[in-house]
Every structure is written in structure tokens, then in C-alpha cells.
Curated annotation (Swiss-Prot):
Biological process according to GO: regulation of DNA-templated transcription
Domain of life: Bacteria
Subcellular location: Cytoplasm
Keyword match Transferase: no
Organism: Clavibacter michiganensis subsp. michiganensis (strain NCPPB 382)
Signal peptide: none
Entries under InterPro entries matching the protein: Integrase-like_N, TACO1_YebC-like_2nd/3rd_dom, TACO1_YebC_N, Transcrip_reg_TACO1-like, Transcrip_reg_TACO1-like_dom3, YebC-like
Descriptive protein name: Probable transcriptional regulatory protein CMM_1817
Gene Ontology molecular-function annotations: DNA binding
HAMAP family linked: Transcrip_reg_TACO1 (MF_00693)
Gene3D superfamilies membership: 1.10.10.200, 3.30.70.980
PANTHER family, per the entry: TRANSCRIPTIONAL REGULATORY PROTEIN YEBC-RELATED (PTHR12532:SF6), TRANSLATIONAL ACTIVATOR OF CYTOCHROME C OXIDASE 1 (PTHR12532)
GO cellular component: cytosol
Keywords: Cytoplasm, DNA-binding, Transcription, Transcription regulation
């Protein structure tokens, strides 16, 4: 590869990274605004806002942006924040089920963009309920390994608070619980002196589909296209990626 083409490739990749960083910031800000609108600006009584702010800070969103988002969402700046949460259902390659969660101020725009991204990237839209039945809402909390020596240490801290299970995912321990137990589990971690990276309510698949490398690449292409949409907040799929396939995907990212 010539020096010029290598620089052009590097510059292109940086532009993509910068664009996705900006989109990530915008989505985090939107979460803060909605949390503040629903529960108010006082974080002592709004755990959803606490989580939204914490996630934004860990992603390096500037504090001024966070403060403005809290005030704007709570109506303290005279602006009206009016977002709707809409869920779209579809299938990626090889029948992998997909839920696309949008937070939008324009339902028609969101629907059109999701449909277009689906059709252009190998996906198909599904009827309401035909995919969602396979997903359950769960509280999902990620604890980095350097915060707790073992899985048993994490489980001991959160079991009485309502945690259902703890799974070791290599770099993090993942705690699952009912959404209504999220606050109690977070507090139990804090009381045990254990910090966490993220705490979110997610749609967790009950049944997963193991995928090969070709299918995984196709699914990732569709997920990337969806993540580029401004109205899309979260994407959930039921693909199960074996370790060797994940290693190959990681190699793809480094090229």
C-alpha cells in the first residue's frame, strides 16, 4: 500500500470514528434530556438521570453539554423536549432477530430511515410482535474485572438486592436483574465498594442463534447502518457469536 493511499485510508477511518463519536454524544444527550423530563433535574430522586449522566461522562461528553441537557430536559431553559420511543422489529441475515429502539421527535422520519437501512443492508422488516416475543426487558449492569476479583465476589454483593445472575464476559462481569431491581442492585454494588461501567435496561434474547463468520459480518453491517441513524438509540440482536468468529471480526476491525 502506498503512503498516500494508506494516509487516505487512515483519514477516512478517522472521519468515520469522529462521525460516530458525534452521533454517540448526541444519543447520550438525548437520553439525559428524556430522563430529566420524566423525573426532573434533581439527581438524588432520579436514578435514571444518574445513570444517563454517568454514561455520558464515561464517554467524555463535556460537562457543559451534560448540564445544558439536564436543564433543557427539565424545562428550565424554556425549551420543549418531545421525543417518542418507538420499537421496530426485523430480521438480519440467516434469520437473526433484531429490535431497533428509536427515540425521535418525528415518527415518520424514523420509520422511513429504519426501513431504508434495513432494505439496503440485507435486512427485512417484521410484523409487530413477531420478533419482540423472544426478548425480555432486563436490567444489565457491567462491572469491570479490576473492580472485583471474582464472579463470586460480585454475586455476594448483589444477590440479596435482586440480582438474577452474574456472568463473566472476559473483561467485565455482567449482572442481570429485573428492571425494577436496578436501583437496589446499583446501591448494593456501591455499598460493597464496587464501581460499575454501565447500568441499562436492555432487551435480552431468550433464544440465540449461533452465527458463522459470513453471517456475523452481514449482521454487523446492518447494525452499523442502523447505528448511523440519528433516531436510533439501541439495537438488540439474538446472534450468538462463537469465540473464533469474534476473533476474526476483531481482525477485520484492525485492517
Amino acid at each position: 500500500m502506498s503512503g498516500h493511499s494508506k494516509w487516505a485510508t487512515t483519514k477516512h477511518k478517522k472521519a468515520i470514528i469522529d462521525s460516530r463519536r458525534a452521533k454517540s454524544f448526541a444519543k447520550l444527550i438525548k437520553n439525559i434530556e428524556v430522563a430529566a423530563k420524566i423525573g426532573g433535574a434533581d439527581m438524588s430522586g432520579n436514578p435514571t438521570l444518574v445513570d444517563a449522566v454517568q454514561k455520558a461522562k464515561k464517554t467524555s461528553v463535556p460537562n457543559d453539554n451534560i448540564d445544558r441537557a439536564v436543564k433543557r430536559g427539565a424545562g428550565l431553559l424554556g425549551e420543549v423536549v418531545d421525543y417518542q420511543t418507538i420499537m421496530y422489529e426485523g430480521y438480519a441475515a440467516s434469520g437473526v432477530a433484531m429490535l431497533v429502539e428509536c427515540l425521535t421527535d418525528n415518527k415518520n422520519r424514523a420509520a422511513a430511515e429504519v426501513r431504508t437501512a434495513m432494505s439496503r443492508n440485507g435486512g427485512t422488516m417484521a410484523d409487530p410482535g413477531s420478533v419482540a416475543y423472544n426478548f425480555h426487558r432486563k436490567g444489565v449492569i457491567a462491572v469491570p474485572h479490576d473492580e472485583a476479583p471474582t464472579e463470586d465476589d460480585v454475586l455476594a454483593a448483589v444477590l440479596d438486592a435482586g440480582a438474577e445472575d452474574v456472568t463473566d464476559h472476559g473483561e467485565v462481569f455482567e449482572i442481570r436483574c429485573e428492571p425494577s431491581d436496578m436501583v437496589a442492585v446499583r446501591q448494593a454494588l456501591q455499598e460493597a465498594g464496587i464501581d460499575y461501567d454501565s447500568a441499562d435496561v436492555e432487551f435480552v434474547p431468550q433464544v440465540k442463534v449461533e452465527v458463522d463468520l459470513e453471517t456475523a459480518r452481514k449482521v454487523n453491517k446492518l447494525v452499523d447502518a442502523m447505528e448511523d441513524l440519528d433516531d436510533v438509540q439501541n439495537i438488540y440482536v439474538n446472534s450468538d457469536v462463537p469465540a473464533d468468529v469474534q476473533a476474526a471480526l476483531d481482525d477485520d476491525d484492525e485492517e
